[in-house]
Amino acid sequence: MKRVHSGFTLIELIVVIVILGILAATALPKFMGIQSGARASILTGARGAVASAMNIAYATQSSTNLASNVGITLDGISIAMVGGYPQAWPAASYLSGIYGAAGLSNDYSIVGGASAGLGGSTTITVANAPTPNSCAFSYTAASVAGTTVIPAKVGAPIVGGC
């Protein structure tokens, strides 16, 4: 009587498991890189939103002939202005400065700024980045000296720690 064997031998199963382990070990760094790339893309998008909000706020204030330090309302959010541009405010006042004007979510942290005075610079970071200070960009509010206005600017993104 002849026996018919079906299925895999133990050695075949071990070989398959080892091959799957090697494939997983080589694929893992690629997946980690995807997360980093996604955070860098999110940061670049936020930088674009801040730059657009800065320009929209400037155009809105210019078109209404308001004094350069008079606040405006964009999409129902009151925006504090300095020199015709949104102020850089600390996180405690997000909905009054560039953070609110750009519509940034709680996925971002904001550090610095001048809440009571004119001008100021703030750093916007991706909150869940491994090293948030290395996954950031800056916003420098306009400054006014007499009748001279130095326009606001958005710094280049730093993506090394994303």
Region locations from a protein language model:
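Alpha-helix boundary/capping detector
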Residues: 1, 7, 49, 57-58, ...
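N-terminal single-pass transmembrane signal-anchor helix
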Residues: 1-35
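Short capping/connector residues at structural and topological boundaries
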Residues: 6, 37, 48, 77-79, ...
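A broadly tuned, weak detector of single residues within folded domains
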Residues: 24, 43, 132-133
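Membrane-proximal N-terminal amphipathic helix
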Residues: 38-65
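Periplasmic/extracellular, small/polar-rich flexible segments of pilin-like filament-forming proteins
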Residues: 59-162
